[in-house]
Amino acid sequence: MVNYLARLTPYIFLLGLLVALSLLASKIAHELVGLEGSILSLPKAAAFYPWEVPALAIVCLALALLISWRVDVNEFSIHYLYRNRLVRCYLGASVENRKPQPFTGFSDADDVPLARLQIPATGTDGVDDRPLPILNTTLNVVRGKELGLQTRKARSFPFTPLCVGFTRPDPASSDLESYFAPASILGADRPDSKNGVRLGTATAISGAAVSPNMGFYSAPDLSFLMTVFDVRLGWWLANPAGAIKKWRIGSPTIGFYWLLRELFGATTDDSEYLYLSDGGHFENLGIYELVRRRCKIIVACDASGDALYGCGDLHNAMGRCRVDFGAEIEITADEIGKITPAGAPPRAMAHFATGLIHYTPGNPADDGIFIYVKPALQASDSADLLGYSRTNPAFPHDSTVDQWFDESHFENYRALGEAAGRAALGSIRNAIGALLTIPMGPVAPLPATPVPNKEFVG
């Protein structure tokens, strides 16, 4: 009974909200025209202003269309607030000789076009060893026609410096349809993205965890409530399968219709514009797109706040890769047991687990190496880390809702990440050496004295 009441609560709230807004509108109308009597007296009201009500509705609709034409549907949300803070905190901190705007603290130089990170072609006598960033987002398909999406309600939608887009099964064959368009011209007709979509925008979409449509977490009542109260971090983007003119604009010209689709959870993958949200609404570890590219070494860091060590995100990624690519990620229960704390106080035997990725059945030469890092404390960790965990029981699995870490909280997470990274580095180097048939040296020890940064911009 309690579960049913919990499910009904959002709908009861919505009904009450609509009734309250209707009564408020009726009260305002009564005051404007000087109508006497109860606001619930509908016959009197209808007799007093039979044409004013439809006229007022038409005026309100016209005003809504005008505003949605002049104000971008993506700007009418908290997305830009979130994006600006991410850019200011992380990208701005790496800019030398930064010259921010005095009042806001922001700078145009903080953000860069995503296409600028593209690895250039090199000659035979040179190799560019920069990493290729892949920013994973979720294409919401809450109302999709494909039966295979009834549970997922989403597809993977990666951003790379070269192109942006998605793939889906071709209903007429066993092949995949690919819809990708250049990142360098996405939104190029807009004054704030003349060189294509910016890194900060793609990063903010990739982290848009709070959205009315959230992949397999989507629910009609939640979509309605979050849209009404404008709790929206997601992004409406032109479909890369559509006209290049719309791709250059990037977002809907008139956003009212698309806002209604967001309100009612009517997102699809074959409309003119697509609704994107946090990549974790499809697959939270970032493994999926790497397996698609058949990477030989994949390092996944699971910071999902999994205090019970159920590894739900890992199991989800393993299932998606198996179903979509036929790739089997093999990681034994013993390996998972090493990173699962036990005893009193609970301590793990390792910071990471290792496994194999079988890309081609029966062909070990195609196998990849999988290294899975998960926050856990070992008895051999530093005394300050172990001491901090005794006074902060949630560490190292604080909820992501907590966005207000103090200095000690931040530093202990950083120190744990460094310890886990150094622990896994030996296995990573050995894996690279095995692939390249080159012996790799030992991992360098921690420096005796940390080298301070020139400047920290928080």
Predicted regions and their residues:
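Patatin-like phospholipase A catalytic core
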Residues: 1-458
